[in-house]
Amino acid sequence: DELELLRLALGQLLEQLGVHHKLLLPNAHGDETEDAEAIEAVLASEAPPAYVERVTGLKLDAAVARRARRGLPDAPILCSDTTVALGRTIYGKPDDAAHAERMLGELAGHKHRVLTAVALQWGSKRLTALSVSRVTFSKLTPEQIAAYVATGEPLGKAGAYGIQGRAAAFIPQLSGSYSGIMGLPLYETAQLLRAVGFGV
């Protein structure tokens, strides 16, 4: 399952910082429904940084409410969201294989941004950070794109690719945060955790 692999990768990034964590997922107890598509919908004229920060804030709001409904003890809650942008065009998760092929075709041969917002709440204190990286894709043939999409790897990933997977073969250059491109920028996350008193 692609979503489980993503959660595992992000969990491994937190463990890299020495942070022990538990997942606070929707519907684990059947006590709520959340419309992820509605949360991740792009608003008219929304710039990529504003979009990813807004979505991360909404995810954090939902997680804080979820913890309260379940009567869980107060602890820091961390959320992140990643989007890919070419100019002002936002590339979220592809709807299907054909959509993934279109996205990759547009990104091929260009430099794009990967924006990951992180938000942390502990009690009434809420802190946020934004990581912006730049990734250059090589030119890709339609056959290369189709073969990559056929692996299933692009589905469920912003911009229809995972840098930690086979797409690394298409990336001659990047600048910024490798962990941020994966979905959780470790430097920014550590800064937020330190700001609320966690020694990382």
Roles of regions detected by a PLM:
Residues R7-P76, T89, E143, A150, ...:
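N-terminal polybasic phosphate/anion-binding patch
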Residues T56, D81, A100, V118, ...:
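Residue-level signal for inorganic ion chemistry
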Residues R88-G92, A119, L130-S138:
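Short beta-strand and adjoining strand-loop segment in the mid-core
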Residues R7-L10, A100, H110, V132-V200:
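GST superfamily/GST-like fold recognition
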Residues Y51, T82-H112, K139:
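Active-site-adjacent loop/tail segments of enzyme domains
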Residues D1-L5:
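Alpha-helix boundary/capping motif
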Residues M103-L104, A117-Q121, K125, V132:
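Anionic-ligand binding region
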Residues P76-T82:
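Ordered, amphipathic secondary-structure segments that act as subunit-interaction surfaces
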